[in-house]
């Protein structure tokens, strides 16, 4: 079973990693689209309501997405009907629960909408670990940037963050 809890060094998880776009949409999505086309990226996974909405609104449909349907701006994500399978999971802030991990395992195959009761932020790590080659994982940075991780190039470095997570026990 796989369950992780953020226990220390929260600052490392807030760092804006490799491809960080400090532009508003649609320009931020256009930058990622250019990257995807230039490097023959085959899979895009988004984590977060605003990022997912922007990708869908500006024509760059992710392979699978994870949202919690809560944003500071009260934004509703349109276009989620594109995803054929909906998986609902519980995932408290600072965690990647077993059920959330299992949902990401399924989502990397494509066509999955993960609806999170709690917080989806940490699921970006699960997507980075589990995504197939030629994938990008995109999420929003808390200061307003769009972060896109090309997993082939940065997976090993970013997975060192798991050293700052503790495995957790979940009640059945």
Swiss-Prot record:
GTP binds at residues 49-51, 68, 70, 120. It comes from the Archaea. The keyword Nucleotide-binding applies. Coiled coil: none annotated. It catalyses: 3'-dephospho-CoA + GTP = GDP + CoA + H(+). One of its GO terms (biological process) is coenzyme A biosynthetic process. It is an enzyme of class 2 (transferase). Keywords: Coenzyme A biosynthesis, GTP-binding, Kinase, Nucleotide-binding, Transferase. It comes from Pyrobaculum arsenaticum (strain DSM 13514 / JCM 11321 / PZ6). The keyword Transferase applies. Catalyzes the GTP-dependent phosphorylation of the 3'-hydroxyl group of dephosphocoenzyme A to form coenzyme A (CoA). Its EC number is 2.7.1.237. This is GTP-dependent dephospho-CoA kinase. Pathway: Cofactor biosynthesis; coenzyme A biosynthesis. InterPro entries: GTP-dep_dephospho-CoA_kin. GO terms for molecular function: GTP binding; kinase activity. Belongs to the GTP-dependent DPCK family.
């Amino acid at each position: 079973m796989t369950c992780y809890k953020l226990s220390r060094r929260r600052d490392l998880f807030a760092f804006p990693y490799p491809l960080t776009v400090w532009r508003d949409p649609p320009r931020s999505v256009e930058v990622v689209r250019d990257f995807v086309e230039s490097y023959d990226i085959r899979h895009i996974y988004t984590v977060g309501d605003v990022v997912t909405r922007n990708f869908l609104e500006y024509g760059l449909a992710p392979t699978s997405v994870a949202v919690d349907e809560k944003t500071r701006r009260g934004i509703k994500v349109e276009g989620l009907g594109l995803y054929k399978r909906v998986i609902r999971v519980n995932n408290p802030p600072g965690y990647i629960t077993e059920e959330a991990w299992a949902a990401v395992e399924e989502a990397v195959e494509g066509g999955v909408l993960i609806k999170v009761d709690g917080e989806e932020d940490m699921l970006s790590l699960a997507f980075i670990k589990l995504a197939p080659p030629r994938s990008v994982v995109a999420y929003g940075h808390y200061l307003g940037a769009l972060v896109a991780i090309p997993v082939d190039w940065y997976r090993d470095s970013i997975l060192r963050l798991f050293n700052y997570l503790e495995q957790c026990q979940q009640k059945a």
